Amino acid sequence: MKRLYMMMAALVVCITLCAQQYQELWIIGTAVPGGAQKLTKVSDNDFKYAGRLKAGELRVATAKKAGKRTTYLVADAPDANIVNKGIGYTVTTDAKQAAWQVVVTEDRYRFHIDTEKKQLRGELFQPWGELFLAGGATEVGWKSEGHMLLMKQDLNNPCIWTWEGELKRHPEVEEPGSFKFQGQDRWHPKSIHPYAADTDILKDQRFHTGGDDTKWTLSVDGRYRIKVDLFNETIQAELVK
């Protein structure tokens, strides 16, 4: 009986450790402005960096300064570029093995680390030429390809888009209080989405680019002012009346 209890206790510990999430992740190295930057924890399994990187190397670490317990996320491919479509990683304590490559100095690097899939995906972000709004809560509805609501691009920052207008539930259509943002005047290929389905546009500023077809929803009908930052993947909305 005692042995069975010990085995069950060990199993609980194992499950706990396997499910443990990183509280923080850092990038350090010659490619990182200032030598070290803390990643943004977007969700339990998603860490993000959006900003300038210099030509050089960086390491993804569990601490700003190396210590005995510091671990690193090392790419499964040799000399892995931080710009990629998704490269798996393993965890190591050997900093020498853990370098990711940054080939050129640029201001708009962005990468995500999915700690559940153990994968890093990165890009050199290019501003979009268009951003549209459509859906059940808009005047154009879901059958709106070719006449979605065009947002206005900021003259000083091409990654910022704004829109002001009425959003309200339209009971006669499917998903009457929902809406989405598209990178073209049709449903594919570019789009942005909240992390959870039916996210209140007034309550959560996070979004991801592409992925699951989740939608925003309204808690209140009214006239809205919306600001989307495509590079930093944030959205701000307010009721203006």
Region spans (language model):
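Exposed beta-strand face motif in extracellular beta-rich ectodomains
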Residues: 56-58, 107-109, 175-177, 224
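Surface-exposed loop/turn motifs at beta-strand-loop junctions within extracellular Ig-like
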Residues: 62-64, 115-117, 183-185, 230-232
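Residues within well-ordered beta-strands of beta-sheet-rich folds
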Residues: 48-50, 110-112, 132, 164, ...
